[in-house]
């Protein structure tokens, strides 16, 4: 009798644990900490310090784009590469894991794609070194 009970309890425990893990994966990798706004957008719910970090990151992109534009206007492809590399994938590692869990999957995909795109711009600026090519990548 006890063997039969064990044979039923263990799979049930495993199933419950798998459901808990699946729920956590959905919450922290797919959904994040979000809510719908009345205008249909998705708001990411962050603590004030996390919000400040996110805004700093966005300002960094604007500043980096300004640096790239200025370097392009001077045909300074080394300057383009330097500015683009500063916005590349290495910068994505600055985001704390707790904050990363609050970001929805679509946002994470966009962020990693954007950082990767700037790495590509940096590499192409060094190897291809054509300002028009870089402008095409930015558009």
Short names for language-model regions:
Residues 1-13:
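N-terminal positive-inside, membrane-proximal cytosolic segments immediately preceding the first
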Residues 10-27:
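Hydrophobic membrane-insertion alpha-helices, especially the h-region
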Residues 10, 27-139:
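Sequence context surrounding c-type heme c attachment/ligation sites in exported
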């Amino acid at each position: 009798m006890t063997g039969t009970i064990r044979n039923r309890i263990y799979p049930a425990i495993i199933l419950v644990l798998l459901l808990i893990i699946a729920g956590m994966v959905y919450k922290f990798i797919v959904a994040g900490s979000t809510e719908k706004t009345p205008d249909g957008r998705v708001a990411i719910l962050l603590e004030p310090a996390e919000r400040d970090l996110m805004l700093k990151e966005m300002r960094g992109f604007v500043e980096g784009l300004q640096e790239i534009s200025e370097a392009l206007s001077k045909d300074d492809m080394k300057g383009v590469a330097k500015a683009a590399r500063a916005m590349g994938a290495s910068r994505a590692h600055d985001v704390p894991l707790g904050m990363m869990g609050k970001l929805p999957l679509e946002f994470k995909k966009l962020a990693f794609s954007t950082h990767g795109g700037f790495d590509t711009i940096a590499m192409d600026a060094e190897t291809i070194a054509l300002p028009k090519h870089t402008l095409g990548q930015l558009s």
